A protein has these predicted regions:
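Extreme N-terminal signal-anchor transmembrane helix of membrane signaling/transducer proteins, especially
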Residues: 1-36, 40
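Short aromatic/basic micro-patch
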Residues: 28, 180, 251
Length: 255
């Protein structure tokens, strides 16, 4: 009888241990699946956010291009290029057109007009020095980094050719319109979205210069410097803006 009780106890104990093993396995699998689902959802959210940011920035460039077109072929601007002898009388009207354009867009810090010899006809806003020859600008061109004349701010230029509408078939250019893009406000795009509380967002240009970063990245200035040491703890995603070669990069912590 004693042996039977011992066998029953051993069987009961084995059953309990087996049950605990099953419960532990199920719990571990549930934890793993929950983490996997959370990770997949986070990565999908990251993909959606980057796509959204690309869309917003592309809309910004389209808006600026439309604005440049309206400036380049504004009757006052066009007449200023075509009727050289009347330029002194049109100076104030032309300046009003450029100033009104400047204040309608938060991303523009300066506007300049150049003739085909590369001489500046007029400029408003922050002063920069353009080194691009109008002869080389046949369509919209996005510049690399440009330093302002006072050395204080780095900006990017968008060059827009102005053609003689009466000689379009011969592609006769009158000059170029230059918009200087202020990149500080691009940070707002990055701060308007949220992936996780500890996700770093950056925008770099085609020369790998840093343009903008979200608030958490700005607070942690050592992050990029120590990237080689910590990059294995983050999912890294990149999306390029085809229009000008800029790239948005996200670092999502692995959990």
């Amino acid at each position: 009888m004693k042996k039977i009780r011992e066998n029953l106890f051993i069987q009961f104990l084995s059953f309990i241990l087996l049950l605990l093993l099953i419960v532990t396995t199920v719990f571990t699998m549930n934890q793993y699946n929950a983490k996997k689902i959370t990770r997949n959802n986070t990565l999908q959210l990251n993909e959606n956010v980057l796509t959204q940011l690309i869309g917003k920035m592309d809309e910004m460039f389209i808006s600026m291009q439309n604005l440049m077109s309206s400036v380049a072929y504004n009757p006052v601007v066009y007449a200023y290029y075509k009727e050289e002898e009347k330029r002194p009388l049109m100076q104030d009207d032309l300046k009003d057109v450029l100033i009104n354009t400047l204040i309608t867009d938060d991303y523009i810090s300066g506007i300049e007009l150049y003739n085909m010899e590369g001489n500046k006809l007029l400029g408003v806003g922050k002063k920069y020095t353009s080194t691009v020859s109008p002869e080389d600008i046949n369509t919209i061109v996005y510049s690399e980094q440009i330093l302002s004349d006072d050395g204080d701010n780095v900006k990017y230029a968008i060059y827009y050719p102005i053609y003689d509408l009466k000689n379009v078939q011969y592609f006769t250019k009158l000059g170029i319109c230059v918009f200087y893009l202020s990149v500080e406000n691009i940070t707002d795009f990055l701060n308007e979205v949220r992936i996780t509380d500890h996700t770093y967002l950056y925008v770099i240009d085609k020369e790998l210069n840093l343009l903008a970063q979200n608030s958490i990245a700005k607070e942690d200035q050592d992050f990029l410097q120590n990237l080689e040491k910590i990059k294995d703890r983050y999912y890294v995603s990149e999306m390029k803006i085809d229009r000008n070669g800029w790239t948005i990069i996200s670092y999502v912590p692995i959990t």
